[in-house]
Amino acid sequence: MSQSDLESSMRKSVEATQRNFNTIRTGRANSSLLDRISVEYYGAETPLKSLATLSTPDSQTIQIQPFDISALALIEKAIAMSELGFTPNNDGKVIRINVPPLTEERRKEFCKLASKYAEEGKVALRNLRRDAIDKIKKQEKEGEFSEDQSRDAQDSVQKTLDKFIAEVEQHLATKEADILKV
């Protein structure tokens, strides 16, 4: 695995962690809160984003405008059944969700969830490091690398890991500050 391949894989892992962070409520309306909702539409699980336009007309409201009005009730049901705790308001044309302010207890729960996502991201990064170092050691055994080259390559992999873990930590700190801001 080349250095650029490793960095690319680690970048994707950090981006996946960032997407997970985006699904956590911060007290303000954000359409990405609904990213994980899928709707049973014509017998298939379909992502909400594929069925409707999501917008945030103000800081406390998410508006969902379905492309097909017949999907309105299905979308409403999927949101109500989700773990987000939102109550959708259906007016026959659009669905509006009022995002209530977070309680202190919910803020702490969401901070814990953000920490969990960050830890999962770090584990994924460490797994990539382990795979890269295993390949380097294998190449050293096969004689492709000298001992010094192997050590240098392993140090480079570790420095790359440290850089990306620091990035995950920075994203976590930003998200926690966002969650705790009243």
Curated annotation (Swiss-Prot):
Subcellular location(s) per record: Cytoplasm
GO biological process: translational termination
Protein family (similarity comment): Belongs to the RRF family.
Protein name: Ribosome-recycling factor
Species in which this protein is naturally found: Synechococcus sp. (strain WH7803)
Keyword Protein biosynthesis: yes
Any single Gene Ontology cellular-component annotation: cytoplasm
Matches recorded under NCBIfam families: frr
